[in-house]
Amino acid sequence: MAKKGAGATRGISPVRPTRALPIGAYLKVADNSGAKVIQIIGVVGYKGTRRRLAAAGVGDMVVATVKKGRPDMRHQVVRAVVVRQRKEYRRLDGMRVKFEDNAAAIVTPEGVPRGTEIRGAIAREAAERWVRLGSIASIVL
């Protein structure tokens, strides 16, 4: 069994937020990487049931295409981490959390952010799982 805190930089979180963003969902981009809107085309590490669309939640890494943004960013396939979702989820202390939009931050395949700042709040679950995102975020809720 894994120790608490093991893998804090990538991947392990004691909270499993509701996966509310299926393939095809559009997300706002919360950082200054040059993309404005992305569409999910895959979820990294998702193991699901046959014929079921993969879905992502807060803290999950997704594969997405850039739909709106700078001309050099458009139509690129990128990796991103979901930092906000509208569907509420429950934390271990009983608090329910939801945000006003669905948003993600563009990262490299290793999890290093491509932008230098994140606009708006990001979820604590995403900041704990992806420490580099938490360090450039303006607010962590």
Curated annotation (Swiss-Prot):
BP terms from Gene Ontology: translation
UniProt GO MF annotations: large ribosomal subunit rRNA binding; structural constituent of ribosome
Classification via Gene3D superfamilies: Ribosomal protein L14
Domain of life where this protein originates: Archaea
Record flagged with keyword RNA-binding: yes
Keyword Ribonucleoprotein belongs to the record: yes
PANTHER family to which the protein is assigned, alphabetical: 50S/60S RIBOSOMAL PROTEIN L14/L23, LARGE RIBOSOMAL SUBUNIT PROTEIN UL14
Function: Binds to 23S rRNA. Forms part of two intersubunit bridges in the 70S ribosome.
Protein name (database record): Large ribosomal subunit protein uL14
Species this protein is from: Thermococcus kodakarensis (strain ATCC BAA-918 / JCM 12380 / KOD1)
